[in-house]
Amino acid sequence: MSLNFLEFEQPIAELEAKIEALRDVSRRDESASVDLDKEIEQLEKKSLELTKKIFSNLGAWQVAQLARHPERPYVFDYIEHIFTEFDALAGDRAFADDKALVGGIARLDGRPVMVIGHQKGRGTKEKVFRNFGMPKPEGYRKALRLMKMAERFKMPIITFIDTAGAYPGVGAEERGQSEAIATNLKAMAGLTVPVICNVVGEGGSGGALAIGVGDYVNMLQYSTYSVISPEGCASILWRDSNKAPQAAEAMGLTAGRLKELELIDSIIEEPLGGAHRDLEAISASLKATLVANLAELEALDTDELLERRYQRLMSYGYC
C-alpha cells in the first residue's frame, strides 16, 4: 500500500514500513514465510490500533493537514464513483474556461443532476493547469451559467467544495473577482431547484462560498471550512505563520465545530485514516447522503424549498 503519511502519522508510517519489509523478505524466502506471517499479523494489528488511537484525538491543525492531503479524492474522483453519464460543460460565455472549477450534467441513480466542483489537480503539471484549484472570476461565472441551465431544465445542483480560496491575482481582480462571488451568492439563494453543497477538502473563504449556498451543506469528517487559512490568520494576528496550529484551534474550522454552531447540516464519516485510504467507502457514504438529501428536497414544492432555504440562511449568526 503506497500512502503519503503526514507528520503526525509518522508512528504509523514506521510500523507500515516494518510490515512492508517483512513482506518483502517473505516473498523472497518461502521457507521463512510461515514464521513471518504471524509477526506480520501482529504488526498489522498494532498498526490498526495505533491508527485508531491517533485518529480518535485529532486537533484542528491535524484535520487541516488531512483536508489538504495530496492523495485526498477530488471532484473528478467522486464523479467517477458516484455518478454516471457525466458530460462536462465548459466556459463562461464571456471570457474563458477556468480549469480550476469544473462542471457538467450527470446522473445520480438515474436522476439528471448538475455537478459543479473545484479541481486542484495532481502532480505539478496538472496543479498548474488547474491553478491549484483556485478559480478566477470566469470560473464562478461558468458555475453560475451551469446553475442557471440546471434551473431552466429543473435539475438539482450538487457542488463539491475543495479550494484554498478564490485566486487573488491582479487579472482576477481586474475582471471582478468579488463581484462574481457576490453574484453567485445572491443567485444561489434564489435558485428554484434543490442545491446540495459538499465540503470535501478545504473550504477556503469566498472561493468556497461562491458555490456553497444551498439547501443542505454537508462536510466530510476531515474537511475544513473557514474565512482564511490557519497560516493567514496566524500571520495577521501574531505576525508569525508558524502559529498556524494555534490559529486553527481558535478558528473553529472543523466539521464538528461547525455542526455545533449549526452552520452545516451533516458530517459524513470518513474511513479510518481519511478519505484517501478508501475511495470506494467514502464515495458510497457520500452518495447515500446525497440520495437522502435529494429525496427530502424533491418532496417540497418550489415555495417551500425557497422558504426553507431562506430560513436556513437567516439563522446564521443567530444567538
UniProtKB/Swiss-Prot annotation:
Protein name as catalogued: Acetyl-coenzyme A carboxylase carboxyl transferase subunit alpha
Its subunit composition reads: Acetyl-CoA carboxylase is a heterohexamer composed of biotin carboxyl carrier protein (AccB), biotin carboxylase (AccC) and two subunits each of ACCase subunit alpha (AccA) and ACCase subunit beta (AccD).
Renumbered to this chain, the signal peptide range is none
What's the EC number here? Answer: 2.1.3.15
Reaction(s) catalysed by this chain, per the record, are: N(6)-carboxybiotinyl-L-lysyl-[protein] + acetyl-CoA = N(6)-biotinyl-L-lysyl-[protein] + malonyl-CoA
Which keywords does UniProt give here?
Answer: ATP-binding, Cytoplasm, Fatty acid biosynthesis, Fatty acid metabolism, Lipid biosynthesis, Lipid metabolism, Nucleotide-binding, Transferase
Localization: Cytoplasm
What does this gene product do? Component of the acetyl coenzyme A carboxylase (ACC) complex. First, biotin carboxylase catalyzes the carboxylation of biotin on its carrier protein (BCCP) and then the CO(2) group is transferred by the carboxyltransferase to acetyl-CoA to form malonyl-CoA.
What biological-process GO terms show up in the record? fatty acid biosynthetic process; malonyl-CoA biosynthetic process
Q: Which residues form the CoA carboxyltransferase C-terminal domain?
A: 35-296
Q: A single Pfam family, by name? A: ACCA
Q: Which family does it belong to?
A: Belongs to the AccA family.
Q: Which GO terms describe its cellular component?
A: acetyl-CoA carboxylase complex
Q: Which PROSITE patterns match?
A: COA_CT_CTER (PS50989)
Extract the GO molecular function terms from the UniProt entry.
acetyl-CoA carboxylase activity; ATP binding; carboxyl- or carbamoyltransferase activity
The answer on whether this UniProt entry bears the keyword Lipid metabolism reads: yes
What metabolic or biological pathway is this protein involved in? Lipid metabolism; malonyl-CoA biosynthesis; malonyl-CoA from acetyl-CoA: step 1/1
